[in-house]
Amino acid sequence: MTVPEEAQTLIGKHYRAPDHFLVGREKIREFAVAVKDDHPTHYSEPDAAAAGYPALVAPLTFLAIAGRRVQLEIFTKFNIPINIARVFHRDQKFRFHRPILANDKLYFDTYLDSVIESHGTVLAEIRSEVTDAEGKPVVTSVVTMLGEAAHHEADADATVAAIASI
């Protein structure tokens, strides 16, 4: 396993998403329905208040909505040597500092913690520190992405062209 040459200067880089993500009440409800989470604090303000929250509470995996956008920006911004069309999540960890609530403005500070290439496959670890409008921590997310090395596709195209010319 090695760090790809084009990624060596990227390790430790920081990216701040240019805008915040506003958590909407209806988005929380829609997401809860989509993931079949029927907890009443996702749907009813009175139930959320009875549980001690000032607004609807987002399901635990709600961060995936905004996080996916930030991840795609990271691959473009850092020019990670990975074929983005052939990438999947290998692992994801969340550390919740507090629940995500309706009307939260979430800000993403994202770091490329590691990039490793082995046998035409790239493993990239991306960490996002998510904060609210006051700069207080909400969630820390660490995602490990696994994908085909970007240059691998070029080799594949050359191989296909060579075979086609026979």
From Swiss-Prot:
Keyword Acetylation attached: yes
InterPro entries: FAS1-like_DH_region, HadA-like, HotDog_dom_sf, UPF0336/Enoyl-CoA_hydratase
Any one Gene Ontology BP term: fatty acid biosynthetic process
Record has Ubl conjugation as a keyword: no
Modified residues (N-acetylthreonine): 2
One protein family per Pfam: FAS1_DH_region
SUPFAM superfamilies per UniProt: Thioesterase/thiol ester dehydrase-isomerase
Residue ranges annotated for the MaoC-like domain, each copy included: 8-131
Keywords: Acetylation
Family: Belongs to the UPF0336 family.
PANTHER family for the chain: HYDROXYACYL-THIOESTER DEHYDRATASE TYPE 2, MITOCHONDRIAL, HYDROXYACYL-THIOESTER DEHYDRATASE TYPE 2, MITOCHONDRIAL-RELATED
Protein name: UPF0336 protein Rv0504c
